């Protein structure tokens, strides 16, 4: 027998959980492809603070055909029969595989606020402007850059993955996320018509 291991042997199901509070909704999202519950109770509250939940749970259902023309489906139903979603990116070598190190590293949500990105973008632009005094406008900012911006997974947590993950504004066009040059993508300058 070979040394093939299944994803279940390599990775644990995601434990990442975050609460979103947007407009008049408070909702829980999970890292395992499901959302709006905490594995026991409803967590999609509208209006927030009312203890009224319009949905109990939901999940991503994705399907497609592989290179061998075989239908593949990933669909969660209350995590009752296995797990179809694992933390982190998959390899691009044709195997679409992962490993425990990647699963552990990516079992989290990266939350960045628009206000943080606005300040960071303004600081980066100030650094390039000879008429802008960054020490006066952004005193001590470089040593206080938010972790959410420093750790943004544009190319992998440690840059070990060769492809882009989370979207970012690539200001120097090198394809590599560097928080001292780039910032997490928000359409701040209204460049996109969506």
PLM features per residue range, with description:
Residues 1-194:
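A long-range scaffold signal marking pre-active-site subdomains of enzyme folds
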